[in-house]
Amino acid sequence: MGWTAVSGAGLSWADAPETNAVSTQLTIPYVPTRQDVVRDLFWLADVGTNDVLYDLGSGDGGIVIAAVRDCGARKAVGIEIDPQRIRESREKAKEAGVTDRVEFIQGDLFTNDFSQASVVVLYLGQRANLDLRAKLVRTLRPGARIVTHQFGMGEWPPDKELTVRTPYLGMFGREANQFAGNPNVPDYEAGRNLATTSTLSMWIVPAPLAGIWRGDVSMPGGKRELKLALHQRLTGLYGSFQLRGATNVEGWVSADLWGNHLRFEGRLTDRPYFEFGIMFDGHIRENTMRGKLAVLERSQIREDQWESRRDKADFTGTWEWNGPVGARPVHLKIEKRDGTWLGDYLDRGWNSRAANGLETTVRDFYDFGGGFYFTFLIGRERNKGGLGYGILVDENAGWLTGEAIAESNGVKGTVSFYPYSERPKKDIVVQQGSQPWSPRRVTP
């Protein structure tokens, strides 16, 4: 099934086969974003003179034109599939006198390049956002901002959020009636979106942080190696540290990532805070981490510049682990195709619907340097062994998610399953069914 957006200064998308996607999408109602909401979107993303803004599904071009006219953006680009909207956008840009700094591209936002964007605006719908987010994270530079109107990014919580309420006569008849009950907008919650409330959200594209990092630390007895094992679920981070020496010191790490700006703290699990701790504030550039490291030991703090390097990682190949029912093995094949990391989920033992079992491409896959993260939607079927993964996507459908880092010629992380209905919620912290995950590589 293919997804393509039509109107980003408004909203439209369709779950339609790509062969007839254009004709289907052109029948979806176009609703422009209110000007007060546009201003708040720009404020939330802090759009300024150095920014290049892309509106994916740009409609009549209102957001694109306003970005350069009102915020002084260096450039703004709209991608829109409807040729009539493209013509309207170009006429409006000419009237506004901004044709030298705007561009309107007729095409599919899933295939067009937007890698130069520092700000991306979306008004597409929950499912379209989920289909698009892997490309956003893969394509945009760390620190780029993604802003959305009304719809979220699943289990990826926003970095900032704003609720806008504005008196607007006629809102009930014009907007709500067109979206409510529209099969092309199944995630539109009519009760929540009535009246004049808009929810605006922003995400900062994270740098690829996952992996094993090593660097020397100057201590009273000489230099000691500090090893970090950092796991990454988009902007969700966790890990551990080991300070090696005559006696190794080990503990857990909590971290916060803002683009390529990283802060982390390390604590011991069995000793008081004032006895030992580490704190870091710095930046990531490819496979190098640089910044200021503070070491707290027996109430004494030492600060110094610190640099660490990430271990090389190779997680290509087919990985095997026991499925959710009994000891039946399932597989995840990870490979790079046309420059993009993808996975194939294989369950040869599941055969109630297909002779070859379940096989599906995992497109929501993220290469985070020394580790990876993935999610995909699967069904559930009941059998004598309990609940197993199946191909039916029904009321029992859910998301299989996994993350791991390359370590000791293998990978180590967690794998989780949780119901489909829970993914849009923003308060999910611990996913249901999460368990340690150390799959075996069965083919290189």
Which role fits each region the language model picked out?
Residues 50-59:
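Conserved class I S-adenosyl-L-methionine
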Residues 129-208:
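C-terminal substrate-binding/active-site "lid" region of AdoMet-derived donor-dependent transferases
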Residues 75-80:
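Conserved SAM-binding motif I beta-strand of class I
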Residues 61-65:
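Glycine-rich SAM-binding Motif I of class I
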